[in-house]
């Protein structure tokens, strides 16, 4: 019996506003427990929420970037449930009238394009955090940190259009890239700024009704999402094949074992007893505001990728790599302002710059070689001042010291040798030393030419102009 997976994702995006969604408390990560709270965060009687305008603006940005319709009127609702890290006894969210709906994202998996529907995007507040590890002076008891309570979130809910773990990861990566490009979230998955609930069910091929779904909560890495979904698909198929029934439930993924385990029964919407929050008036968004936000949107990764291919003539692979992060794309474009040859710039950014960043675990924004300095290095190559090989040595010194390339070349004596007399002298010495190889070359072993080039370059310590070396060497060997 063949089965097909049906997957829908609920993604929680923590917004990088300075203050919380309904109060003025800081959202800074890593502060002392319960040091960023107020009567609103703590759910004190009589404390009234005040909506953060920036949160609404960020929600509109997310909606426009994911092809959603922006509701001219939306309302906040109370989602009622009890949990120790929810001080009010309810979460302020949106239910019947979310701010964004009916969107989509297009993904590519193994060269095949697919459109994934987005049901809705709504604003809500985050809950606090339970700390179960040993706490000095407390022992084994669980502790509640309410610093995160009232932190602004967007919940982005997909349609059940995904059919594999690979599709789910492709969708998540694209969504993650968009929210980071927009600047509305840092997307830090380790800190919980971008986390996912995966709804998974399986159905027999040919069936017209979805199977019973489970929800795996708060998976916070692309790798773990893939593992959790693949495990859950296999588990559900095994249960059905053994004659059992899938229980609608909430499950947790254990990254250490790679399996999901039952957490609790899965609630339905009516279990939360949603009703409009009486402390918050309906949110009315004018067309003018939406258009102002639209005009302020940055160029999104898909549009940037296509522009790099169409206008700059870059291969698809280069365009994909360079647009992977907004910071990398900004660095590339800043370099182009000083050196208007896209392909060489792309090669160096993807090659030496990325290598150096990875070796030191640096961000591109912290690179000691600025775009202007990299452009100056490429100009030295174009002028014939240094060879491409020597340029890599110069780059390493620039990275270490922050010096300009011309300064490094001068200090290290790395100027390329193009004088034919000097190069010819080196060639003569090499050919005299390798007389046996010369005889073999002249007897028909043309592949030895590369060997001679290498010997000449080594003898010149990489300074000889490769073009001049090739020209003179060919004449000598054919003479």
UniProtKB/Swiss-Prot annotation:
Substrates-to-products reaction catalysed: L-glutamyl-tRNA(Gln) + L-glutamine + ATP + H2O = L-glutaminyl-tRNA(Gln) + L-glutamate + ADP + phosphate + H(+); L-aspartyl-tRNA(Asn) + L-glutamine + ATP + H2O = L-asparaginyl-tRNA(Asn) + L-glutamate + ADP + phosphate + 2 H(+)
Enzyme class, UniProt record, top EC level: ligase
Gene3D superfamilies xref list: 1.10.10.410, GatB domain, N-terminal subdomain
Listed EC numbers: 6.3.5.-
Domain of life: Bacteria
GO molecular function, one term: ATP binding
GO biological process: glutaminyl-tRNAGln biosynthesis via transamidation; translation
Entry keyword annotation includes Cell membrane: no
PANTHER family documented for this protein: GLUTAMYL-TRNA GLN AMIDOTRANSFERASE SUBUNIT B MITOCHONDRIAL AND PROKARYOTIC PET112-RELATED, GLUTAMYL-TRNA(GLN) AMIDOTRANSFERASE SUBUNIT B, MITOCHONDRIAL
Similarity comment: family membership: Belongs to the GatB/GatE family. GatB subfamily.
Assembly notes: Heterotrimer of A, B and C subunits.
Protein name as it appears in the record: Aspartyl/glutamyl-tRNA(Asn/Gln) amidotransferase subunit B
Gene name of the record: gatB
């Amino acid at each position: 019996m063949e089965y097909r997976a049906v997957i829908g994702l609920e993604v929680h995006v923590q917004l990088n506003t300075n203050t919380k969604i309904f109060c003025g408390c800081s959202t800074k990560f890593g502060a002392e427990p319960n040091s960023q709270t107020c009567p609103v965060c703590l759910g004190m009687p009589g404390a009234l929420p005040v909506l953060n305008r920036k949160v609404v603006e960020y929600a509109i940005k997310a909606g426009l970037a994911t092809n959603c319709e922006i509701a001219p009127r939306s309302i906040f609702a109370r989602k009622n449930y009890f949990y120790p890290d929810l001080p009010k006894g309810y979460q302020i969210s949106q239910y019947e009238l979310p701010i964004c709906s009916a969107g989509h994202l297009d993904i590519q998996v193994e060269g095949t394009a697919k459109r994934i529907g987005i049901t809705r995007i709504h604003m809500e507040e985050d809950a606090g955090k339970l700390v179960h590890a040993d706490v000095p002076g407390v022992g084994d008891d669980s502790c509640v940190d309410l610093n995160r309570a009232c932190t602004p979130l967007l919940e982005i809910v997909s349609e059940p259009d995904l059919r594999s773990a690979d599709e789910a990861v492709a969708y998540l990566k694209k969504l993650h890239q968009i929210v980071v490009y927009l600047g509305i979230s840092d997307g830090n998955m380790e800190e919980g700024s971008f986390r996912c609930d995966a709804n998974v069910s399986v159905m027999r091929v040919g069936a017209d009704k979805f199977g019973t779904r489970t929800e795996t909560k708060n998976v916070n890495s692309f790798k773990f999402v893939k593992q959790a979904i693949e495990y859950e698909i296999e588990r559900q198929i095994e249960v059905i094949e053994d004659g059992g029934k899938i229980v609608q439930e909430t499950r947790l993924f254990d990254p250490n074992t790679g399996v999901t385990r039952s957490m609790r029964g899965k609630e339905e919407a009516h279990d939360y007893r949603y009703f409009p929050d009486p402390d918050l008036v309906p949110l009315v968004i004018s067309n003018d505001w939406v258009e102002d936000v639209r005009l302020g949107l940055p160029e999104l990764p898909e549009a940037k990728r296509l522009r790099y291919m169409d206008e700059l003539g870059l291969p698809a692979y280069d365009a994909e790599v360079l647009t992977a992060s907004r910071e990398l794309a900004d660095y590339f474009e800043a370099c182009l302002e000083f050196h208007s040859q896209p392909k060489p710039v792309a090669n160096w950014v993807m090659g030496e710059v990325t290598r150096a960043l990875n070796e030191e675990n640096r961000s591109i924004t912290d690179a000691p070689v600025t775009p202007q300095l990299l452009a100056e290095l490429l100009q030295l190559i174009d002028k014939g001042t240094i060879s491409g090989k020597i340029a890599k040595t110069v780059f390493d010194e620039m990275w270490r010291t922050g010096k300009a390339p011309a300064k490094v070349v001068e200090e290290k004596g790395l100027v390329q040798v193009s004088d034919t007399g000097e190069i010819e002298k080196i060639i003569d010495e090499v050919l005299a030393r390798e007389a046996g190889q010369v005889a073999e070359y002249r007897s028909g072993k043309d592949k030895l030419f590369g060997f001679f080039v290498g010997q000449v370059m080594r003898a010149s310590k990489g300074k000889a102009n490769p073009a001049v070396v090739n020209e003179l060497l060919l004449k000598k060997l054919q003479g």
